[in-house]
């Protein structure tokens, strides 16, 4: 490992990839494994217990490859902290310091407390377990997602964005994962095939509770992933005064709207990614 002089003195560099197992971070890992473009010592995943099953299957599929390559893997479980923050944490008003509510409720929106929890856990791990190193952190943000860099800008690691350096877009990252056999298949009884591919119906495979999902994504979840829609309804029932998408757009109101609109036929006419990959070869 190389050495770098900085405010902490001279420490050997330790190269960590911070991943979510979405298309960006997964494609970054696949490229790093295929070609030694950058050094990689460890992969770190902060698990909030709010990921789609298909996303965790991508993790399980790649872990043996990391082991074969001698790359360490660390998973930080903050699922209990996530639920505490969602339901029980006293939330203070930033101006007055007074407690004005209990629990953050929905993650996403203007208060990205879920992201804050993940970053806090990640950097606590770096400080506690890897303080003897200068951490070089690889983050799987694509070139058309550069604004996301700001969420990672205030921490003490040396940050690298390989996909931005390589000019990889989100669409290219998804396609690259498909070409390597990673499809984010989610089981469902809503279609005859018994499965859907998350990146065909969602823009991002983020936390299934995230209120940042757009109406198209939510409609697809309602019709194609009823098991996750039930979870959204349960959370909405726990916070009835906070509509998921704002006034007049609670999960229950959106359900009525989606039923009135009807489902989109095009959702069921799509060519599954595995078949599409064969056709394009």
Where are these regions (language model features)?
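Nucleotide-activated chemistry modules centered on ATP-dependent adenylation/adenylyltransferase
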Residues: 2-281
């Amino acid at each position: 490992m190389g050495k770098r002089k900085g405010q902490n003195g001279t420490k050997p560099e330790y190269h960590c990839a911070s991943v979510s197992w979405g298309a960006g971070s997964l494609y970054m890992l696949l490229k790093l494994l295929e070609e030694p473009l950058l050094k990689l010592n460890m992969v770190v995943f902060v698990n909030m217990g709010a990921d789609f099953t298909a996303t965790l299957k991508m993790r399980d599929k790649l872990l043996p490859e990391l082991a074969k390559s001698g790359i360490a893997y660390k998973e930080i479980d903050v699922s209990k902290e996530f639920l505490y923050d969602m339901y029980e944490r006293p939330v203070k008003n930033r101006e007055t310091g007074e407690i004005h509510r209990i629990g953050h409720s929905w993650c996403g929106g203007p208060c990205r407390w879920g992201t804050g929890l993940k970053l806090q856990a990640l950097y606590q791990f770096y400080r506690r377990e890897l303080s003897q190193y200068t951490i070089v952190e690889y983050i799987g943000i694509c070139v058309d997602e550069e604004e996301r860099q700001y969420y990672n800008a205030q921490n003490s690691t040396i940050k690298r964005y390989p996909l931005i350096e390589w000019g990889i877009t989100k669409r290219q990252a998804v396609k690259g994962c498909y070409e390597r056999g990673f499809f984010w298949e989610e089981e469902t009884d809503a279609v005859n095939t018994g499965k859907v591919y998350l990146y065909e119906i969602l823009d991002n495979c983020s936390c299934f509770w995230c209120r940042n999902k757009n109406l198209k994504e939510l409609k697809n979840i309602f019709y194609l992933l009823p098991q996750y829609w039930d979870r959204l309804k349960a959370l909405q029932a726990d916070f009835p005064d906070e509509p998921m998408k704002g006034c007049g757009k609670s999960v229950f109101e959106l359900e009525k709207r989606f039923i009135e609109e009807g489902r989109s036929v095009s959702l069921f006419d799509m060519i599954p990614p595995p078949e599409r990959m064969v056709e394009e070869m």
